[in-house]
Amino acid sequence: MGKTLYQNKTLYQKLYDAHIVYEAPNETPLLYIDRHLVHEVTSPQAFDGLRAMGRPVRQPGKTFATMDHNVSTQTKDINASGEMARIQMQELIKNCAEFGVSLYDLNHPFQGIVHVIGPEQGMTLPGMTIVCGDSHTATHGAFGSLAFGIGTSEVEHVLATQTLKQGRAKTMKIEVNGEVGPGITAKDIVLAIIGKTGSAGGTGHVVEFCGSAIEALSMEGRMTLCNMAIEMGAKAGLVAPDDTTFNYLKGRQFAPTGEQWEQGVAYWRTLKSDADAKFDTVVTLDAADIAPQVTWGTNPGQVIAVNQIIPAPESFSDPVERASAEKALAYMDLRPGIKLTEVAIDKVFIGSCTNSRIEDLRAAAAVAQGRKVASGVQAIVVPGSGPVKAQAEAEGLDKIFIEAGFEWRLPGCSMCLAMNNDRLEPGERCASTSNRNFEGRQGRGGRTHLVSPAMAAAAAVSGHFADVRDLSAATH
């Protein structure tokens, strides 16, 4: 692994090149896949394809499955979310048993959102290629792994061969330097980035996040960042592994031990972009300029600081952006020129693969403590996994939420997407810690505003959007 192999390479190029199995002239290279994560929604047809051709799962020990999208967060009853959900979950149980794949089902203590359980169990390691039939697989890039979402036909290909054809992407460096102010989180950083690049600014690229503000983030913050790389159109997001990464991983169930751990860390330290590496695109931000962010429109790029006014469509010079803003304002039932702090909410959702880890729940609980959810607001807190739920309860966070009037739920994807019982009714407005604010994402006619966990809790206790910096407990 000498320097000569890696001269002038970005982290992405190192990861990509290390996994090429075969590359013929004028053909898309074939990459080896180290880890394959599976859930109940995008896998049934893939397993059916294997069965029809009489193929086994090539390396079942590198494949892990869980139930998350369809599950009820109020009961562990497989029938609770409707017939389609029941069928998909039962199919996953059958397929995993038949093909020898490890499954974290509803009764398993590790069950949870696939992009939460992978890292917390140490399945996600630096230097790996990781795929899942889910667009937010980019989350795992926080560990310096090349992780991206795939379609169901590709799920079948990986199950059958442990490989995937994958073309080279362009490279983008997003550098955030300086220190963020009090109350500013990774969610605010990534929303500010998407606000600058636009929701298609990263199209065709793999993004590497770097700079002193990124290095200062915990692994949980870095996961939030990489989770939303897809929301700027990127194929994947990356953060170079460092001591923060290694300290997080050490001792986790699937992490290496002993001499293998030492060898792993020695290799992982080489996984960074060379000083002379060239990126196709470079974006820079000053961390000190970032305020708490709230989306106002129907894509994550339509975002402003909480203390700014909702923009008028005429303020956009690009005609496509102007038309998009007009449509978004109409759908969201918002008027240009008003402050977001004047906008009342109906529901609050704290959860999702973006923000349902223990640090997210601690940040929200710090705001909720000693306060009450505003009259007429329904607020739910959905931990990302069984271990997150257990840790939160050991710390007494569940009691803080319940006392404040929040609902404390079981793990699952929940209100991030309208595939289970947690959804918005037409016209309802939600402060959500999830990653997508598209029309109907949380339920037909629902209006989604993306915020950090602390900002979501602030909205819950205020009844409208509020600057978390104005609430004294935000100095947790």
From Swiss-Prot:
The EC number on file is: 4.2.1.33
Q: Residues that bind [4Fe-4S] cluster, according to the entry?
A: C353, C413, C416
For the protein in the UniProt heading, the enzyme class is lyase
Q: Does the keyword Signal apply?
A: no
Q: Which GO terms describe its molecular function?
A: 3-isopropylmalate dehydratase activity; 4 iron, 4 sulfur cluster binding; metal ion binding
Respond yes or no to whether keyword Oxidoreductase is given for this record: no
Pathway given in the UniProt record: Amino-acid biosynthesis; L-leucine biosynthesis; L-leucine from 3-methyl-2-oxobutanoate: step 2/4
CDD domains reported in the protein's UniProt record: IPMI
SUPFAM superfamilies per the record?
Aconitase iron-sulfur domain
- Can you supply a Gene Ontology BP term from the record? L-leucine biosynthetic process
Give UniProt keywords alphabetically.
4Fe-4S, Amino-acid biosynthesis, Branched-chain amino acid biosynthesis, Iron, Iron-sulfur, Leucine biosynthesis, Lyase, Metal-binding
Catalyzed reaction equations: (2R,3S)-3-isopropylmalate = (2S)-2-isopropylmalate
Which prosthetic group or cofactor does it need?
Answer: [4Fe-4S] cluster
| Annotated cofactor note | Binds 1 [4Fe-4S] cluster per subunit.
Which InterPro entries would you find in this protein's record?
Answer: 3-IsopropMal_deHydase_lsu, Acnase/IPM_dHydase_lsu_aba_1/3, Acoase/IPM_deHydtase_lsu_aba, Aconitase_4Fe-4S_BS, Aconitase_4Fe-4S_dom, IPM_dehydratase_rel_enz, IPMI_cat
* Subunit comment: Heterodimer of LeuC and LeuD.
Family listed: Belongs to the aconitase/IPM isomerase family. LeuC type 1 subfamily.
What function is annotated for this protein? Catalyzes the isomerization between 2-isopropylmalate and 3-isopropylmalate, via the formation of 2-isopropylmaleate.
In its UniProt entry, what is this protein called? 3-isopropylmalate dehydratase large subunit
What gene name is given for the protein in this entry?
Answer: leuC
